[in-house]
Amino acid sequence: MRGGTANCCVVISEEEIICPIVLEPTELIAMNLPSLLKFEPTVVKGGTIFVNSSIITEKVTRDDVRAIYVPCLDIANELGNAKVANMVMLGAYIEAMGNLGVETIKEMLVHMFTGPKAKLVDLNIEALRRGAACVK
């Protein structure tokens, strides 16, 4: 949605997920200021907030969460495609949280991008790598 917030809750678990509704997330990825302002208060104490610092100049106001600032759009533009800003953030998330494997994501990309779109695999992998480097 342009000019507002859009959100999606993702539950990662090795056990059966009974209810996918998340009222108090352990992590938040804020790609724009309205999303940060709306969802920052919902993150649990001790949680992690990832901020797209290319667009959001404000800092996380809470001191009971970990804040990670990633210049997603700047990096994506350096790579020549603003559409991979989300992959830059995913790379930072994977590096910081350690609950997903980069190899798993790479396998998914190879599976998803076939035929003429196969050329996008390397771009997306580089975006992941650059995002991860922001956290190291």
Language model features by range: what are they?
Residues 1-136:
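Active-site cofactor/cluster-binding pocket
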